[in-house]
Amino acid sequence: MITNTTERLDHVGESGFAGCVSQIQLSVLLSLLCVALLALAGRRPYVEECRGRLRQTLAALLLIGILAIAVFYPVTSFGEAEDIDLEMLWFPSLLTGHVVLTVFLLLWWRLRGDVSLAAFLHLSGRGLWEKLRRGVITGCSGWVLTVMVTGAAAGAMAATGRVAEPEAVPPIMVWLANLPVLYKLIIVAAAMTVEEAFFRGFLQPRVGLVLSSIFFALSHFSYGLPFMIVGVFTISLMIGRTFARTGDLLPCIVAHGVFDGVQLLIILPWAVRMWGTAVA
């Protein structure tokens, strides 16, 4: 769930303005480098999909901008979600990032101008029930695999003695766990549709399964939870493989919804309660 990249930008105080500017600059530089390396590898979607120099230039700038905002800014602000003033946090601001992604997708689609929106998003009405079934199976099995992989990673790190036991649940996670069910459903709905449209429907066909999954994991860096990143990368690979097999975004949307729904509605509240009981 991309819930706090733009939220942090809204809550930067005057004392942290210079640091924020440097983070933004670094994010743009990383994005420029990434797009340049992709171009050297022959991946230039702004050239291949857009007609005319002006449209190609605008598309390239859009790509650099969205990668800077959605992927690399969270990397440069690793762990800063803990610094958000939760008392001042306005719920609709959590969806700002999804609005930005939506605007990007619509602008890119308009710059192309040669394909329907449904085709651009890899959506069709054929085999609806089979896609829904596949999505539910992928989401459920993805949870099992993610728990196994994350547990194995945590166990391996614990064996080395390099992982300090956390003293408390991150405040942002407690805040999310205590949200009303309706708000949680809104977050899930935004994440399952917009994030899948961007990372799977847009990025994966253009940069590949592995790199789009890496980008998806990087977009969650601001939470400052390394094992969460492992889990996000794992489920992204699994959902991405489903997209590669079906060529349709709907199973991915359903799988993402199942995964985030279980996480927000069941696992996270349970984990917060269990941690509170253990500490008490």
Please identify what each model-predicted range represents.
Residues M1-E130, G155, G261-A280:
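N-terminal, membrane-interfacial amphipathic/helix-forming hydrophobic leader that caps
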Residues E7-G13, Q25-L37, W143-G151, V163-A280:
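Transmembrane helix-loop-helix hairpins at the membrane interface
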Residues L86-W90, L101, R134, Y183, ...:
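Short alpha-helical transmembrane interface motifs in multi-pass membrane proteins
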Residues V100-F104, V136, S141, L185, ...:
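Extended, compositionally biased low-complexity polar/Lys-Gly-rich tracts
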Residues D114-I172:
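"…centered on the first transmembrane helix and the immediately adjacent amphipathic helix/loop
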